[in-house]
């Protein structure tokens, strides 16, 4: 005797926030800050995480699509016209003025989001879905350890702005070139170590003088680098519940492939 398996329920499409760019700023040579808002802001489901992120939808202008996009129909009938999603940390969510700010790292003409940000101007449209996120600094943590590359600096900055002035710990960040190293005010009890590459980031974490007590750890960046850092944290016996750890990107992978690999062994960070 056989029975039919229950049909898999499709998740409803997330609401699309159709926003208008209101300001752009070249914060550093490789960082462009975009602020966007408007009536569509209310479609964003906000949260209190300091690492909150949104999915930004980029449609190929050659396809003549206008938002909101019927992603389900495009996926089924015209997959070649399907817009691309890119994940970005929200630098600031201004509920009162109904606008959000996102920092885009730009490296020439690479990718989709960076070139868009480089040419974006007030009046342009930005379509976003979200927000996600789960980390927020715990004021009761014995100390904090924040490990990041350039992609996670916006989340680190937001976390610092929410920390008590008496917070202690360490920030270790891989951001090449001094002109690109940007953080808000850091509590007096926290140290900041800047490095220029992933190997130096791993070494700095490995060589860190470990304080007493279990730290709350935020570690995000390139996938293989984060895997190496995870092994160090295991050696330090940091429990999983004290960790916010994941890859934001993978070297040699476009985001579409990177996101797909999250469900495969290569994409797992245990």
Regions found by a protein language model. Name each.
Residues 1-270:
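Extended, composition-driven regions rather than compact fold-specific motifs
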